[in-house]
Amino acid sequence: MPHSHCHSLRSFHNAPPLSAITHGTNPITFEDRLCLPSSFHSRTCFLDNFQETCNETTSCQMTNCEQDLFTDDSCVQSNCFPGVVQTTYSNSRPCERTACQSESSSAGLACVSQPCQSESTQQMGFVAQSCQPASLKGNSCPPKTSKSKNFETLERASSQCQCQSQNPESSSCRPLVNVAPEPQLLESSPGVEPTCCVTGGSQLPSK
């Protein structure tokens, strides 16, 4: 395999522009490309005009709602309604830009997209996305204190039943709190006392 014509970029002032990189027997032409140093195993080549590529304009795309615009604690969730999605400034530059930052390696740069600045957007008079409560779609936001906490007491009152008479000869059982319907006793054979009732009926004695 012939030696590659890639030059290591250990110093920027000695890096000549490359026109071709040969792999195997098939020459492949890459115009205006630079090769990474030999410490990178994959021999990846980048465009040397990445500075112009990173400065290209893109449309404004705001994906997250700003919590400062909606601070009502009664609503748990809020929907983000888009205003003007593609907002551009008067100088034909969008509110979202991509900037190039140098990595730890001196051979490559990474493009990082910066979010929209709401201050400059408001000063230019453009409409940005805002957070609106979900109640605008027809779903009301109930207050936090709307949960009823008396289910436990009602259920407890309807399930407790005891015999009020202390006379062992008495066979009538009545509920402690008159919330559930009156329990009905089943007919039993003479001489057998029914036990205390439960909610909705009586227990038959075990034979």
UniProtKB/Swiss-Prot annotation:
This is Keratin-associated protein 27-1. Pfam families: PMG. One of its GO terms (molecular function) is structural molecule activity. Interacts with hair keratins. The lineage of its organism: Eukaryota, Metazoa, Chordata, Craniata, Vertebrata. The keyword Hydrolase does not apply. It comes from Homo sapiens (Human). The keyword Repeat applies. In the hair cortex, hair keratin intermediate filaments are embedded in an interfilamentous matrix, consisting of hair keratin-associated proteins (KRTAP), which are essential for the formation of a rigid and resistant hair shaft through their extensive disulfide bond cross-linking with abundant cysteine residues of hair keratins. The matrix proteins include the high-sulfur and high-glycine-tyrosine keratins. Keywords: Keratin, Repeat. Belongs to the PMG family.
